[in-house]
A protein has these predicted regions:
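Short, solvent-exposed loop/edge segments of extracellular or virion-exposed proteins
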Residues: 8-10
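Short, conserved loop-to-beta-strand elements that form functional interface hotspots
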Residues: 45
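N-terminal intrinsically disordered, low-complexity segments enriched in P/E/S/T
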Residues: 13-15
Length: 558
């Protein structure tokens, strides 16, 4: 059996499994409201990866703890975090540390992000002879794709093939001599090549590498509808994190909606775990309408097609309803769950569920690259980092790969990681011998093949564009500051034609998520009103700290 750790939530005992997150433990016991906003509304886990800050709780008297990132490793006393509550006072007789007093490390190559791309970059550079240090915010390496199971016991489903592949990659990196530091948040990037980071125990450190590989991944892009801020509404990735790391279901009844293959994978996994999957609501039409693209996928990666068909088969044989050409148009509380209104093709349906998972693609986590001055272009949906074929950005010594640069999936990220790692090592003066040259050639071919797969995949999942003009005024645009679309539209109508001006007038983007969710929406509103396409200067300027950090840590008082 799993090791049970007693925790208290609002004075009530909650049995938790050792190693799982606080969010997983609370969710497993039907507790979905974690934070209380300034309007006395509840918020719960939304992103599941430390980005949204909606799951903030007080742990052992310390506020500002992200429930999804806080591990149950001992008995804990947890309370909801309430807006405006008094903060604990901490004093120190020592003066704040100056920048020169902070510990400095000068690795030859610094890799930020321990997902598939970052690990492959680190392995390749290390094999070429470079000294490599990898920093990652998560408690264990692997990233969002290879996140490992964090709990153990006879009652826990064992790791699957995807888990095992990730564990093997981490073992390969360590065997090669790569230094991996987990639980480290890189919250500052300064030109030309300086980084500030804080560990989970509060030590703040400066890193001055000769070169850097940025592989910070992406976070999910939901679509705003009335009620998307309610507890019980979360991203597809959040629900998948609950299952893949903690073997916890987000609820007994789960609806999954949006666009893309991750929703299908989640449905198959949760159904296999015992959930009642109410429906998979897909904005695109049936895959059967794109036989040519499906054939192109099979030619590019037969194994991934077989995997996708297996997910479809598990949903089909499990009786999971698949609703194509439909989208969520609103969510409202009903009893202990949610009532979700679906529209599409002139039809409307209302289904009840405990949890609604939303997944409409991804947004790159590119703040470090932007702060370093790397060039970005806007592809109509998101910023894309300019890179050459080896991952070199417009800034010398800065390499980037994976979903933080645009979107390409884990297989493309891994192949691009090998290319970037070898290029970085070569740029540092290390020789690339015949064996590594063959690896480089193979990685380039693999990257191209999987890009063809991705192109065909998104042809299959091509869906009608969601219109920002159709989002009702009473819908929340800024989840943190509780600003609605109507206020944003009014500010733009008053002549405020840039994101910074709207931010100052309405507080959109001033919350703890730092505009990660509202910025793309605001850019779309401004573009719609002005007729000007977004570019790399359209959003909010990236400013440190990019991650939550205490004033005590900033002062160097660990």
């Amino acid at each position: 059996m799993s090791e049970i750790v007693p925790i208290l939530f609002e004075g009530e005992p909650v049995p938790a499994r050792a190693g799982e997150s606080v969010a997983a433990a609370l969710t497993a016991h039907g507790i979905r409201g974690f934070r209380i906003t300034r309007t006395a509304a509840e918020r719960g886990m939304f992103c599941g990866m430390g980005v949204c800050q909606d799951c903030l709780v007080e742990v052992d008297g310390l506020p500002g703890r992200r429930a999804c990132m806080t591990v149950v490793d001992r008995p804990l006393t947890i309370r909801r975090q309430r807006h405006g509550q008094a903060l604990p006072t901490q004093t120190s007789e020592l003066p704040p540390a100056t920048i020169d007093e902070l510990e400095v490390e000068r690795p030859e190559l610094l890799v930020i992000g321990a997902g598939p791309g970052g690990l492959c970059a680190a392995i390749a550079a290390r094999r070429a002879g470079a000294e490599v240090v990898v920093l990652d915010e998560r408690r264990s390496p692997g990233g969002q794709y290879f996140k490992p199971v964090a709990v153990a016991g006879d009652d826990i489903q064992p790791p699957d093939a995807q888990h095992r592949e990730g564990l093997a990659l981490v073992a390969q990196a360590r065997a090669a001599g790569v230094v991996i530091r987990s639980g480290v948040s890189v919250w500052g990037a300064f030109r030309p090549l300086e980084f500030a980071a804080t560990s989970g125990t509060g030590e703040t450190q400066r890193y001055l590498p000769r070169a850097v590989v940025v592989a910070t991944g992406a976070y999910e892009r939901p679509w705003p509808v009335p009620g998307w801020e309610l507890p019980g509404v979360m991203t597809t990735g959040a629900a998948q994190t609950l299952w893949r790391t903690a073997r916890r279901l987000p609820g007994r009844r789960v609806m999954i909606a949006g666009n893309g293959p991750l929703n299908l994978q989640l449905a198959a996994e949760l159904h296999g775990g015992g959930a009642d999957v109410v429906a998979v609501v897909e904005a695109a039409g049936s895959p059967a309408r794109s036989p040519g693209a499906a054939a192109a996928m099979a030619l590019a990666s037969p194994a991934l097609v077989v995997q996708g068909l297996a997910y479809q088969w598990r949903c089909l044989t499990g009786g999971v309803p698949m609703l194509h050409n439909m989208v969520v148009s609103s969510v409202e509380p009903r009893g202990d769950g949610l009532a979700v209104t679906l529209t599409g093709g002139g039809a409307m349906r209302v289904l009840e569920t405990d949890v609604l998972c939303l997944g409409y693609g991804f947004e790159p986590s590119n703040e470090l690259l932007r702060a370093l001055g790397c060039r970005h272009d806007h592809d109509g949906m998101r910023l894309v980092t300019w890179r050459d074929a080896d991952g070199q950005t417009s800034v010398p010594g800065v390499y980037a790969l994976g979903d933080c640069t645009g979107l390409g999936g884990a297989r493309v990220a891994a192949a691009d990681g090998t290319l970037a790692g070898l290029a970085a090592a070569a740029g540092l003066g290390h020789a690339i011998g015949p064996e590594l040259a063959r690896d480089r050639k193979q990685a380039a071919a693999t990257a191209q093949r999987h890009r063809r797969f991705q192109q065909a995949l998104w042809t299959v999942y091509r869906a009608p564009a969601l219109a920002i003009a159709q989002v009702p005024d009473d819908t929340m645009i800024c989840r943190c500051e509780e600003v609605r679309f109507g206020a944003a539209r009014a500010a733009i109508a008053d002549g405020l034609a840039d994101a910074g001006s709207v931010k100052r007038a309405t507080r959109i983007g001033m919350g703890p998520c730092q505009g990660r969710y509202c910025r793309p929406l605001l850019e779309s509103l401004i573009s719609e009103a002005t007729g000007k396409a977004p570019d790399e200067l359209s959003g909010f300027a990236p400013r440190p700290p990019f991650r939550p950090v205490t004033i005590r840590d900033l002062a160097g008082k660990s």
